[in-house]
């Protein structure tokens, strides 16, 4: 079988490595514009239980190969904070890895297995020819996939552009922080959200997110991420943290969530963010990419008929991702209104509000009933 993959992100690379491991006679070619995936937005991933299981099925020694020169902290707890409250909760065990580390490991693994990586940017008009030249074409080219756009009607694509802006940073201080951190700090402009994962004991990959209105107000108005750092450091250090953000030289991005009604058209299939992309609060992360890649590879290993394999892949993934997609959309809509949610809630309840999101109305009702003696 001859397979071409457009894009060398986690989904396409994992698929190529896994399938080539079990079908070394398959001819797999990845088309990737030089450094495009490596330089794409985002600076890291958190690998949790399912991710490590899937990596181990491809490479029993993946951890040693991934971290050959250093040790990364194991994450077992999540720290939630607002301006004046905090709570530590259990976290599904995992560890963080930089984007560069993960992609370099997967690229090296792919080439060692005989996968061809070609330095070429595929244009939309070239996709039909690829479909003629190969038995199967995978669009693994990320959230702005050219195949997704070219076949949007056939694939029944949908996207939701949230009224939220985010960007990536690193935080490096003397303070040790090995938890996954989720902060929501209220300010004059609105609520600033911080999500971070430890790369070392003293360094974290950080996402800062806020509503469009928040970014367009007060001290943040008109400021690029680098210019906003002094204000963000001051605000986010008010509850016991040492925040000293380092810019990733990336702009503010508008968050976009992708979904599809169908994952393939003829002999072309979508994989990874090209098909589904979720807000981080849905708890999916790189798991979606690995799960889709593994599922498609399994379908091809069990079905010599490509059409049947793609039909099974489509059914399995849409079944698997229906609920995460609903959760992601629900949370995105909640975050779009987070400034208002905090404004109408007493500060003593901000942490519970943040933790329970759209269920908080029931939380308040329950507490009110208990306070009046109705609750038993």
Stretch-by-stretch model annotation:
Residues 1-11:
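Beta1/beta-strand and adjacent pyrophosphate-binding region of the FAD-binding site
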Residues 10-17, 138-139, 251-330, 334:
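Conserved mid-domain beta->alpha element of the FAD-binding
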Residues 11, 36, 144:
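Conserved Rossmann-like nucleotide-cofactor binding loop
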Residues 20, 48-170, 375:
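Conserved N-terminal helical subregion
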Residues 20-41:
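Glycine-rich FAD pyrophosphate-binding loop
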Residues 34-54:
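Conserved N-terminal glycine-rich FAD pyrophosphate-binding loop of Rossmann-like flavoproteins
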Residues 133-241, 247-250:
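Conserved FAD-binding catalytic core of PHBH/FMO-like flavoproteins
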Residues 298-376:
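C-terminal helical "tail/cap" subdomain of flavin- and related membrane-associated enzymes
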């Amino acid at each position: 079988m001859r397979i071409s993959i457009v894009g060398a992100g986690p989904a396409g690379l994992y698929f190529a490595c896994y399938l080539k491991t079990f079908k070394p006679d398959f001819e797999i070619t990845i088309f990737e514009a030089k450094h495009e995936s490596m330089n794409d937005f985002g600076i890291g991933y958190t690998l949790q239980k399912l991710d490590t299981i899937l990596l181990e099925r491809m490479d029993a020694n993946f951890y040693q190969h991934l971290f050959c020169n250093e040790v990364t902290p194991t994450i077992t707890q999540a720290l939630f904070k607002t301006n004046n409250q905090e709570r530590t909760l259990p976290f599904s065990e995992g560890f963080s890895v930089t984007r560069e580390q993960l992609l370099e490991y997967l690229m090296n693994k792919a080439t060692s297995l005989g996968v061809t990586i070609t330095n070429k940017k595929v244009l939309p008009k070239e996709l039909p020819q690829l479909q003629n030249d190969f038995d199967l074409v995978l669009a693994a080219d990320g959230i702005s996939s050219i195949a997704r756009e070219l076949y949007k009607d056939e694939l029944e694509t949908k996207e939701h552009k949230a009224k939220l802006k985010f960007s990536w940073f690193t935080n490096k201080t003397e303070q040790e922080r090995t938890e996954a951190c989720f902060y929501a700090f209220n300010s004059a402009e609105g609520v600033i959200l911080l999500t971070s994962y430890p790369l070392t004991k003293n360094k974290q990959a950080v996402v800062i997110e806020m509503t469009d209105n928040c970014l367009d107000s007060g001290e943040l108005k008109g400021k690029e991420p680098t210019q906003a750092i002094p204000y963000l450091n001051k605000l986010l250090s008010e509850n016991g943290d040492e925040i000293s953000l380092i810019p990733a030289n990336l702009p503010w991005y508008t968050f976009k969530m992708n979904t599809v009604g169908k994952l393939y058209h003829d002999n072309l299939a979508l994989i990874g963010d090209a098909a589904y992309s979720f807000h981080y609060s849905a708890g999916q992360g790189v798991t979606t990419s690995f799960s889709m890649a593994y599922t498609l590879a399994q379908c091809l290993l069990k079905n010599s008929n490509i059409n049947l394999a793609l039909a099974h892949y489509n059914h399995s993934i849409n079944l698997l991702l229906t609920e995460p997609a609903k959760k992601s959309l629900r949370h995105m809509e909640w975050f779009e209104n987070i400034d208002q949610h905090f404004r109408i809630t007493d500060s003593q309840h901000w942490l519970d509000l943040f933790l329970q999101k759209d269920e908080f109305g029931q939380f308040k009702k329950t507490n009110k009933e208990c306070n009046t003696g109705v609750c038993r």
